Regions:
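Non-heme Fe(II)/2-oxoglutarate
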Residues: 1-88, 109
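Catalytic core of non-heme Fe(II) oxygenases with the double-stranded beta-helix
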Residues: 95-124
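Short acidic alpha-helical/loop segments enriched in Asp/Glu that coordinate divalent cations
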Residues: 84-95, 114
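Sequence-level motif detector for i,i+2 pairs with an aromatic at +2
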Residues: 1, 7-9, 91, 96-98, ...
Length: 124
């Protein structure tokens, strides 16, 4: 585990620790979601845009049973991060607003954006 202080921003980096079988199952589920949304023939943001589940109706992965173990791990890391930067996690009410997968293939990209409504964001 490592904390990187970058100006006023602290970045927490760690391995989540999913076993390979579960990781492969989750990846397949993400591809299934992508394929399911292919019924919408129009790419939301252009031909070179990556697939982002949030704009295709898959913005609540944390509510899906298949992703429960992943989010249990993420929760532990969030609490660890908050403790490490000096906050009492018992005084904070943690909750997920949204969570989604992305699929980026060669020459595809995700447009610049921010998560201004969130105090913490993570990527896995």
């Amino acid at each position: 585990m490592e904390i990187i202080n970058l100006f006023p921003l602290s970045i927490y980096r760690s391995k989540v620790g999913l076993d390979d079988a579960l990781r492969k199952t989750l990846i397949q589920e993400i591809y299934n979601q992508e394929n399911e949304s292919k019924n919408n023939k129009t790419k939301m943001y252009g031909e070179r845009s990556s697939w982002t589940g949030d704009v295709y109706g898959h913005e609540y992965l944390y509510k899906e049973k298949k992703f429960e173990v992943l989010f249990d791990h993420i929760e532990k890391h969030i609490i660890n991060y908050v403790k490490k930067i000096g906050y009492n996690e018992e005084k904070i009410d943690f909750y997920y607003q949204r969570s989604w997968a992305t699929v980026s293939r060669k020459n595809e990209y995700i447009k610049y954006h921010n998560h201004s409504q969130s105090h913490l964001s993570f990527a896995y």
